[in-house]
Amino acid sequence: MTRMLIIGPPGAGKGTQAARISERLGVPAISTGDIFRANIKDQTELGREAQRYTDAGNLVPDSVTNEMVRDRLSHEDVSGGFLLDGYPRTVAQVEELDRILEANGVGLDVVLLLTADNDELVSRLLGRAQEQGRTDDTEDVIRHRLDVYDEQTAPVVGVYEDRGIVVRVDGLGSIDHVTERIMAALER
């Protein structure tokens, strides 16, 4: 059984690696983005509430996000483990995830932290923006996103480091090489 988080800066390849690792480990990859989209598409009560915030250009509050994650982690397919991407993003969400898992009688096994040099990430994200025609993703905007990530995520990583469950892996290199580094790190 593997219950894990994948954390890393924008452009580090979390989504790509989450899909590959979950397939190898035989556990579902769960991204908060997917949870939001599914709830909105299915017009669940939580989905309608989230959509009211996003339509107004506001961030969805923790209470709604937490409930969506709580609901998703109650599904049968996660009984053998999961790989969670995009949550928790704050120490308050760490505490909520602890409560959710405790209520299910389980805990986290590992927090996979993908690391990468910021200049490399900027280059990668600028290339992605160009491919996707996202003219709003300028270098300044990307660097700001990386700064926000650092500020928000450092305390989250700190909590899990104190618990001794963080595994750091360099997220740069070919997709296959990064996957192999992750699998090797998880086997230690």
Curated annotation (Swiss-Prot):
Pathway terms, separated by semicolons: Purine metabolism; AMP biosynthesis via salvage pathway; AMP from ADP: step 1/1
GO BP, one annotated term: AMP salvage
EC number: 2.7.4.3
An example Gene Ontology molecular-function term: ATP binding
UniProt subcellular location: Cytoplasm
Span list, region LID: 127-137
Main localization (coarse): cytoplasm
Recorded superkingdom: Bacteria
The protein's enzyme class: transferase
InterPro entries in UniProt: Adenylat/UMP-CMP_kin (IPR000850), Adenylat_kinase_CS (IPR033690), P-loop_NTPase (IPR027417)
Catalysed reactions, semicolon-separated: AMP + ATP = 2 ADP
Binding site for ATP: 11-16, 128, 173
Region annotation (NMP) ranges: 31-60
Residues reported in the UniProt entry to bind AMP: 32, 37, 58-60, 86-89, 93, 134, 145
A GO cellular component annotation in the UniProt record: cytoplasm
Keywords: ATP-binding, Cytoplasm, Kinase, Nucleotide biosynthesis, Nucleotide-binding, Transferase
Keyword NADP (UniProt): no
Quaternary context: Monomer.
This protein's domain notes: Consists of three domains, a large central CORE domain and two small peripheral domains, NMPbind and LID, which undergo movements during catalysis. The LID domain closes over the site of phosphoryl transfer upon ATP binding. Assembling and dissambling the active center during each catalytic cycle provides an effective means to prevent ATP hydrolysis.
Family label: Belongs to the adenylate kinase family.
PANTHER family, per database record: NUCLEOTIDE KINASE
HAMAP family to which the protein is assigned, alphabetical: Adenylate_kinase_Adk
Task performed by this protein: Catalyzes the reversible transfer of the terminal phosphate group between ATP and AMP. Plays an important role in cellular energy homeostasis and in adenine nucleotide metabolism.
Protein name: Adenylate kinase
Origin species: Kocuria rhizophila (strain ATCC 9341 / DSM 348 / NBRC 103217 / DC2201)
